[in-house]
């Protein structure tokens, strides 16, 4: 009976749907730029099909990682809802504000929001432009990947001057 119970637990765990995990701010390290994740309004995660969770300190690091690792078997990508931290939302359901008046940890000034109804208020408060996840991928591709000015995965020493 004990063996059957253990086997059942193992099978259930193996069949579990991969999902995001809480980010431990001040402890977890960004899987892209290697900085410690400190701002609870900007954390992001990538969950693989096998359940591995990769953590990021900003939407732009998640997008850059996505560009540089197209082979990753992704189950889902998540970003923190700026107005409701530490709530994680799927990137497909989020909208992103690109505004110099709302600085993100890596300096590309991308902030995720979860409620579409808030778009007008957010634009009125901060200015800028609203992007979809595809828009974020395009922006990061142009600003960091193609230009070669984004942080590399080789640590903080390779970070651009505008990042902090």
Predicted regions and their residues:
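Sec-dependent signal peptide recognition
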Residues: 1-8
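C-terminal motif of bacterial Sec signal peptides marking the signal peptidase cleavage site
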Residues: 11-14
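Mid-length scaffold segments of soluble, non-membrane domains
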Residues: 55, 59-88
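Thiol/selenol-based redox catalytic cores and closely related redox-interacting motifs
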Residues: 75-147
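Post-signal-peptide N-terminal segment of Sec-exported extracytoplasmic proteins
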Residues: 26-68
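Residue-level marker of regulatory loop/turn positions in helix-turn-helix DNA-binding domains and
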Residues: 22
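Bacterial signal peptide processing site
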Residues: 16-18
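Histidine-centered metal-binding segments
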Residues: 151-164
